[in-house]
């Protein structure tokens, strides 16, 4: 029995969107679901109680950062990541691969793993499939990710071909090194850049290894969104229907809706918390940058439709004042709002799937949000 299982409830008659439930050792969550990112074992400025109050069911933490500080051995001795950070719901940890390939300029890829330099102090480090599994087993997350190479985009066909072949070999080593399959589910990551045949090959390789779930990696790395959507349309049908499907690194409202339409169950991104820190807020009518001078005397909430703590209690003028004054409370309030907005959006997406009207919802949302879509009923 896998530690994590997927229960399919229904498919939207308007699209390929799925309503489902993912069951984990620390509880279940409905999908499609957005996962707030807690890079350093905390979702920045947020308490676990606040996250639960806004219906965040699962959060993501970062293997690379927790390995370097405080160390996976410290977290193991604390009783695992759940106890360490006082979060009793499901946790997903990434493998650290994306950070190795995105944060470190000095790296050397070998068959056994990657040599690179610490992004803060320059010390030499080595991360391999075996090491990534050891760290994540110490962390004790419910869902852990295979160690993969995330090729840049654009990259040549030859480079990406060699990369996915290496990722497949690394995936096999991850399965061999995984010590806790009974209470931690290991997901494989499909790569392939913008090349459909390489996405097909990567998917076939990984599906043959029978992981409990699958992610699509290497998208949302700067490519135009039409390319991302084309890769999703090609790749998602290659993934097992009875297992969770996870699109890594996606968190803009339009991409969440488009991903759900194409059959994705799980999403994560630092976007809502990162932009909150400079005063950028997502609302039903588009983004609001509260630092702008036009909000100095705007005594209305960020979003009249929003039921979050921030919108029920504070105005754009007050938020502008806090952000301009570099007050931590301002960052907390904008973070609360952005996370609530995306989690509530996913609740609306699930309800639209339940009622077989996700494309209708997309049209309504895009029009109000101010997204220019020529034919929103197409996908």
From Swiss-Prot:
Q: What Enzyme Commission number does this protein have?
A: 2.4.2.29
Residues that, per the record, bind substrate = 94-98, 148, 191, 218
Question: Which cofactor is essential here?
Answer: Zn(2+)
UniProt KW Hydrolase keyword: no
The active-site annotation reads 94, 268
Q: Which family does it belong to?
A: Belongs to the queuine tRNA-ribosyltransferase family.
The protein here is known as: Queuine tRNA-ribosyltransferase
Organism field = Macrococcus caseolyticus (strain JCSC5402)
Name of the encoding gene: tgt
């Amino acid at each position: 029995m896998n530690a994590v299982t997927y229960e399919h409830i229904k498919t939207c008659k308007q699209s390929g969107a799925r309503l489902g439930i993912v069951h984990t050792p620390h509880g279940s969550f409905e999908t499609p679901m957005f996962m707030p990112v807690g890079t350093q074992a905390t979702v920045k400025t947020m308490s676990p109680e606040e996250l639960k109050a806004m219906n965040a069911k699962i959060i993501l933490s970062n293997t690379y950062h927790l390995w370097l500080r405080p160390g996976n051995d410290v977290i193991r001795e604390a009783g695992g990541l759940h106890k360490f950070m006082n979060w009793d719901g499901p946790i997903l940890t990434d493998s650290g691969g994306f950070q190795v390939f995105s944060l470190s300029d000095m790296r050397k890829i070998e068959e056994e793993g990657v040599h690179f330099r610490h992004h803060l102090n320059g010390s030499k480090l080595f991360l391999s499939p075996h090491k990534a599994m050891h760290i994540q087993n110490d962390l004790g997350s419910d869902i852990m990710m295979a160690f993969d190479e995330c090729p840049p985009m654009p990259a040549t066909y030859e480079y990406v071909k060699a990369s996915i072949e290496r990722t497949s070999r690394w995936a096999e080593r991850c399965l061999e090194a995984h010590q806790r399959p009974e209470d931690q589910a290991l997901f494989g990551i499909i790569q392939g850049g913008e090349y459909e045949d390489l996405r097909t090959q990567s998917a076939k390789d990984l599906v043959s290894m029978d992981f409990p779930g699958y992610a699509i990696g290497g998208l949302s790395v700067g490519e135009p969104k039409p390319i991302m959507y084309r890769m999703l349309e090609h790749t998602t049908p290659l993934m097992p229907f009875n297992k969770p499907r996870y699109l890594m690194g996606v968190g803009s409202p339009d991409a969440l809706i488009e991903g759900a339409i194409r059959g994705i169950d799980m999403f994560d991104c630092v976007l809502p918390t990162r932009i909150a820190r400079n005063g950028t807020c997502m609302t039903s009518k588009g983004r609001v940058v509260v630092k702008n001078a036009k909000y100095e005397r705007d005594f209305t909430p960020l979003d009249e439709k929003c039921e979050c703590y921030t919108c029920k209690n504070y105005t754009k003028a007050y938020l502008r004042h806090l952000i301009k004054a570099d007050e931590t409370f301002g960052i907390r309030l904008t973070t609360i709002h952005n996370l609530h907005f995306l989690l509530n959006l996913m609740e609306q997406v699930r309800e639209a799937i339940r009622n077989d009207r996700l494309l209708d919802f997309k049209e309504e949302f895009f029009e109000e949000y101010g997204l220019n879509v020529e034919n929103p009923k197409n996908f």
